[in-house]
């Protein structure tokens, strides 16, 4: 973050200065009293189980220059500033929106049901060849992570790629009011969070909130093979990316190299790109095509775009292939799961050589689709010839309806012995479930064994 003054902060958050020097400089923003550094402003957030206002004195004592507060502390420490605001989370949003407005660089906002983080990372990899690029860390894509990402901007940055997630209506709009994108990306519309939104059509409406803050002369980049996204019509320039003939950015000549990755050709109105994607899964061609389209739009050369795709590295626990002795391969894709991403990952496993083991768990937030979706995934494991299926979790029991040979366990701890026993020589093992299942415990156990 570039230094700002208390006066600038005060104006950005529309607050009331209770105490402090308006000329004092602020070097950063922190919402965690445990990690606050000298010169930062502490923003106490209120959650279901905590109230950051209880830690204001601790943060100030640790070196914070001052704080925002909706609840004023009983004691105001001398030499520090205190700004009163109605709501600290909204103040954080206002500050991030004001700070982002100080930068005239291209901002890319990414959302979608599946593949947000992968696509964000791919775009950042491509843009990073030419531009010093800020990107959302991990998947810090909510009301707290997005402003923190934006507040990490510096004058050295030449582009920014911001991932925004949602589980309810209005969330993408809220985040977009901070990002104000020049380029808006929707990866697809799937069943994630359908429990809360009711239908794919409602999910589409929620995702399309991204366009409410897209600049009038901006660019929309959409999955051209997504039936619902093909109903979207915008006044802004729109590029549809995919395998279909109508796509503006066309993927062809897809060569599946198994766990070694994918090769494909991406053709735009201007250029033909021969792309080598260093991670498995045919679905990766969409992220690569979108990244190529954006790179070209922002003036990158053919060589820069091809090099950026080849340099892509997956974010943590997203189809991360770990190799072991005896040709054992662990496909760590445990960060999250929905029906579409689970099917895509199982197809990667199905294309792998040797014995194939799927360790799969609950797919959450599917509402009325829960039983059917899990049963269909079970059927897919049978169709793909997966040798061993280990299903874990309450919802995962429905996998066995689609594949009666699947082994079922109620919890990760109960299944651990069977998982270890199945990870034998010449085995490719996929580990995937919704984040709430904490399948990272399985990966940690296997990698330390």
Report residues per predicted region:
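Phosphate-binding loop of NTP-binding sites
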Residues: 8-11, 91-224, 228-237, 295, ...
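N-terminal leader/targeting and accessory segments in enzymes
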Residues: 1-94, 98, 350-354, 379-380, ...
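Acidic, Mg2+-coordinating active-site environments of NTP-dependent enzymes
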Residues: 10-12, 73-79, 185-329, 354, ...
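Peripheral docking tails and interdomain loops at the edges
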Residues: 408-410, 426-447
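Active-site beta-alpha connecting loops in nucleotide-dependent enzymes
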Residues: 49-50, 314-317, 334-405, 434
């Amino acid at each position: 973050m570039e230094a700002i003054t208390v006066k600038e902060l005060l104006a950005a958050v529309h607050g009331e200065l209770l105490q402090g020097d308006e000329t004092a400089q602020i070097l950063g923003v922190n919402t965690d009293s445990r990690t606050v550094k000298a010169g930062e402003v502490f923003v106490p957030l209120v959650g279901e189980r905590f109230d950051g206002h209880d830690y204001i004195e601790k943060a100030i004592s640790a070196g914070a220059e001052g704080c925002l507060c909706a609840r004023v502390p009983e004691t105001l420490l001398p030499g520090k500033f205190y700004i009163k605001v109605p709501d600290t989370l909204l103040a954080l949003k206002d500050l991030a929106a004001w700070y982002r407005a100080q930068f005239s660089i291209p901002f890319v906002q990414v959302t979608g049901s599946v593949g947000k983080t992968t696509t964000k990372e791919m775009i950042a990899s491509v843009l990073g060849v030419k531009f010093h690029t800020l990107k959302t860390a991990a998947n810090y894509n909510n009301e707290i992570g997005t402003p923190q990402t934006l507040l990490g901007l510096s004058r050295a940055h030449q582009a920014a790629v911001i991932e925004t997630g949602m589980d309810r209506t209005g969330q993408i709009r809220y985040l977009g009011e901070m990002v104000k994108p020049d380029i808006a990306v929707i990866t697809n519309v799937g069943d994630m969070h359908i429990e809360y939104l009711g239908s794919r059509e409602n999910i589409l409406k929620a995702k399309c909130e991204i366009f409410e803050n897209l600049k009038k002369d901006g660019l929309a980049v959409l999955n051209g093979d997504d039936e619902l996204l093909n109903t979207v019509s915008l006044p802004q320039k729109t590029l549809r990316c995919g395998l279909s003939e109508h796509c503006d950015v066309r993927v062809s000549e897809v060569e599946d190299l198994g766990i070694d990755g994918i090769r494909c050709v991406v053709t735009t109105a201007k250029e033909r790109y021969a792309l080598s994607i260093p991670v498995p899964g045919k679905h990766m061609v969409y992220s690569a095509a979108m990244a190529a389209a954006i790179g070209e739009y922002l003036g990158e050369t053919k060589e820069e775009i091809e090099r950026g795709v080849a340099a892509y590295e997956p974010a943590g626990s997203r189809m991360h292939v770990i190799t072991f002795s005896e040709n054992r391969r662990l496909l760590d894709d445990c960060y999250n799961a929905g029906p579409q991403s689970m099917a895509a990952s199982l197809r990667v496993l199905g294309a792998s050589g040797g014995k194939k083991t799927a360790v799969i768990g609950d797919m959450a937030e599917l509402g009325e689709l829960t039983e059917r979706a899990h049963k269909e995934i079970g059927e897919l494991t049978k169709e793909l010839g997966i040798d061993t299926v280990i299903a874990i979790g309450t919802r995962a029991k429905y996998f066995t309806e689609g594949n009666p040979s699947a082994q079922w366990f109620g919890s990760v701890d109960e299944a651990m012995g069977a998982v270890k026993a199945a990870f034998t020589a010449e085995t490719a093992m996929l580990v995937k479930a919704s984040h709430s299942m904490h399948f990272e415990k399985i990966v940690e156990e296997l990698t330390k064994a």
